[in-house]
From Swiss-Prot:
The chain crosses the membrane at residues 24-44. The keyword Oxidoreductase does not apply. Residues 45-743 are lumenal. This is Ectonucleotide pyrophosphatase/phosphodiesterase C27A7.3.
Amino acid sequence: MSNRVVDVNSKKTGTSWKKKLMKIVIWSLAMLSFIAGLVLLGLVAAATISGSKNLPTAEYKWAGCENLGKCQIDGFSTPPLVILSFDGFAKEYLERRIVKSLELIAECGVKADRVYPSFPSKTFPNHYTMVTGLYPESHGITDNYVFDPNLYPELLAMRKHEAKEFYQAEPIWSAYKRLTGNRVHCLFWVGCYYNITGYMPDVSPDYNQELPLKERIDTLIGWLKLPETERPALITAYLHEPDQAGHMQKNVNQELEEVNNYIDILMKALHDENLLECVNLVIVSDHGMQALNNSIEVETIVNMDGLVLSKGVVARIHLNETDRSIDEVAGEIRCKIDGVKVNTINDIPLRKHYSKSKRVGDIIIEGKPGTSFYKSETNLGDHGYDYHNENMHTVMFARGPSFLQNVTVPSFQNVQYMNLWLYLLGLEGTVDNNGTIGFFDSILKNPPIRENKWDSMEECLNFGSAEVLQCDKAEGHDLKKLSLHLENCKEHQNLPIYSKNNCFQSYCENSLIIHKNRQDVRKGVIESLTFSFSRNQSVFENSFSFVNTKYSIECPKLDTKDNFFTAGSEAISKLANAQYKFPSSFMKSELISSLLSLKDETIKFVDIWVPLSIKTDEYLKHYGKLFVLSGLAVDRNLDGIADDEESKEPTHFYRILITCTGNWLSTNPPLCKKYSDTKALAFVFPILNKKTTMDCMDSDAILLDYTSTIEDVENIASFQFQIGALSHQQNVYLRRNITTSLW
């Protein structure tokens, strides 16, 4: 019995063991299949990310500058222009030293110190800016998602909709076709399919992100090898990396290697086909990339009834079907979250050029770098931030017969590109844009000879001798001495500004810029300030206002004597016509006298005038001398351009500061012994009597946010700024210099 039991158990044990073994085998095979599947998916994903099929490692056989500019093929008397964009190539990527191909291009060509995207730093707006030279507010593509109820009742994703009416400007391919009739080809560039000008590229295949990079190269080379009558004179091409890797914050270095390999293959193909020295190649990008670390959902803070919300690292709110005002809605989130700025189109800084079009929205919400106004499990990096964020900065490299060798162009904003394209295609000056003609002259082999404009501003009509007419009573001043000074001082005929609408009044070291229509409030003051320890540090204490009887025999009628917009503190600076009664939210004049003597670190202001006055005074102490231009401007339609109509109420206040870090040659006009010693800083502030996001910003943050270029000031104040002793190129760089930090 026991033996039978043993036999039975032995059979069961054997059967059980075989079943277990079979399960192990099946499980193992299943696991192997699963792992193989994961590997395959990984390979497919990698191929999808890069869009390439095992590109060979870069060899750089094309490198070297021995034959630079020596095209050996007939039919290339005018070099074709190839513009190649790598989406999301941050300037920071260059520091990783992975994309050696770009370094080699720069050795034989040119590069930019850095390129600032336009605001917001998104793909669609900036790609269209690069080919139109217009800010997004002007060309219509104000974001990757656009809301325009006149065209469509919902928020539209530009990448999904054939909405040609959204593309309002003329891109370079359209201008070239219209003006020359020659051929243009486009490979996936934003707007190639939808612009409404009527002049489309001759060849523009449908967007296909899966098209392998090798095939894209073959396409470009094939186009360049066409017979001269069929060959495009302009090619624009777009590649979606390294942007996708940047968004995922994974395999960025691997993707940069792919980009490097791609450029190497392209350059080798150009070299092998003897095209390298016959083509002007410009490599650009639209923006950088920022790692995300914070998410805020606007819907949980703001009542969204009747509103349209566009999400992103910049959130935009459109008032659509609501009776609430812009200020009411903005007030629901303004100053409620640390580090979040809530602007309306009325108070957003002019330098962002984001108020002209209704498509920008009514309220623009920005957070600190790393903050997004949406939730995503996969998006670990993004862009769209203010170009003051250095992670948004990007690159430009160029090589070809028209470019100098091993030259760096100073930092610039991407609105400048259009004038470069027009010059390289022989069409300079034919299309208006937001760039400045001549900005890129320093990188070109044969730039045009450009001269400064020598227009001079007229002196205002005068009535006789220069004497002081005191406009408010003050004791202890020697009016005769001041009158003698006005009568005998040298007049400044060589002022650094010109305007056909204005004239100047000479006040010795200073000049008053007056609108020829005396009823118009627009005016400015030029001051040459020198610091001395005996200088009265209070702007208004013991000073008095006056006019020069050479230009006026009566004082202006104002309700206050305190609201001067001059920077100096001496009596000579208290020009009565440099008075304007600012709203209390702009200037609390009764505080200035007692506060200017305090140390900056002990004060935190939310008004504009006080921190600006303190900062100007601080700079004067530090540098010893300052050239200051301050004034009032009118721009009611918020397009950044001075209004033509007469106005008695200014909308903006501006100030330009210029100093020398070395020796001065002149203070008015401001001129340093060495141009490289010149420092310039400009501001444009809205004049508003309402709550703004400035109420919850510290003084330095306010000042930095409302910096601008000198050209921005020129446009809104309706004058031209130029220092005659500087070259045309130096004046352009000075006027278009972008400030990303205070002095």
